[in-house]
């Protein structure tokens, strides 16, 4: 990602297509002044909700937004099975963001989630631009463990970010304030519901009586999380250390949530818009 440092200005001779791909809720200067920085551990979802409501003219204290979103925490002191379970659902899902925004706004604001996995028949920036111009406020739910720049450490979480504007091939987001290429954002928005857990986070919580079979959800069985842990332990005993992460199920779905005021034409349009077609 490239941090935003200055406002992007389009030339007067931009063609119609470029104009159709441009829309801003806030200017970059306004975003710098108005954005909410992360309000707590695992609270990127609640942070996004604060800014969504702000953009829609509803002021809510960060603590109230966090309470309404019901941010879930990592249980770092738990034995491995419970720790992994907590990691799979830490933070919030798009469903929690929608419910939290509705509760915090006392029913004034509604949200509608659009799945982007499996891949959809949509051009992301023009699609976002159309909704932003209508007054909708988008929040991206992304798997940040995809498209990691070479040489950088793999992030350890998914992330919710408010999108405050788009330009041709570029998406503008808060928390942190970034401009990111459309290709990069789209890849992170089209992810299976999985999470990578670092080797050291697994091994330091492993105990002799550890029973991974307590994770009985079929998705844990399908990913053979127990087998992955066994493989990691075997490699450690043999001094190999090849497996850097295990893959576990995640509660999150990748995609875009669009928010609007309920008592508006846009709110009703959002509720009645069909899902994006699968490719």
Q: Over which residues does each language-model region extend?
A:
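Cysteine-nucleophile protease catalytic domains, especially the papain-like/related folds used
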Residues: 9-120, 210-211, 221-224, 228-235, ...
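Noncatalytic regulatory segments and standalone regulatory/sensor domains
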Residues: 5, 154, 166-279
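Conserved active-site-adjacent core of cysteine acyl-enzyme catalytic domains
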Residues: 4-12, 73-203, 207
């Amino acid at each position: 990602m490239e941090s935003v440092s200055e406002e992007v200005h389009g030339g007067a001779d931009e063609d119609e297509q470029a104009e159709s791909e441009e829309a801003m809720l806030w200017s970059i200067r306004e975003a710098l002044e108005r954005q909410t920085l992360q309000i707590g551990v695992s609270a990127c979802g609640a942070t996004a909700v604060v800014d969504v409501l702000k953009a829609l003219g509803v002021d809510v204290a960060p603590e109230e937004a966090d309470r309404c979103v019901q941010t879930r925490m990592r249980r770092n002191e738990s034995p491995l099975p419970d720790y992994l379970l907590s990691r799979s659902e830490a933070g919030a899902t798009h469903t929690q963001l929608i419910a939290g925004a509705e509760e915090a706004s006392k029913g004034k604001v509604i949200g509608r989630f659009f799945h982007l996995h499996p891949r959809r028949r949509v051009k992301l920036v023009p699609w976002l631009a159309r909704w932003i111009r209508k007054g909708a406020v988008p929040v991206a739910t992304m798997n940040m463990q995809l498209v990691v720049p070479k040489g950088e450490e793999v992030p350890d979480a998914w992330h919710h970010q408010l999108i405050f504007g788009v330009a041709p091939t570029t998406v503008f987001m808060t928390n942190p304030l970034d401009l990111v290429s459309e290709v990069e954002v789209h890849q992170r928005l089209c992810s299976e519901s999985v999470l990578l857990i670092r080797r050291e986070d697994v091994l330091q919580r492993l105990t002799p009586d550890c029973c991974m079979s307590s994770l009985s959800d079929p998705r844990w069985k399908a990913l053979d999380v127990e087998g992955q842990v066994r493989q990691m332990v075997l490699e450690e005993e043999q001094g190999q250390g090849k497996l850097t992460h295990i893959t576990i199920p995640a509660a999150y779905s990748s995609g875009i949530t669009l928010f609007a005021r309920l008592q508006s034409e846009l709110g009703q349009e959002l509720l009645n818009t069909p899902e994006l077609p699968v490719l």
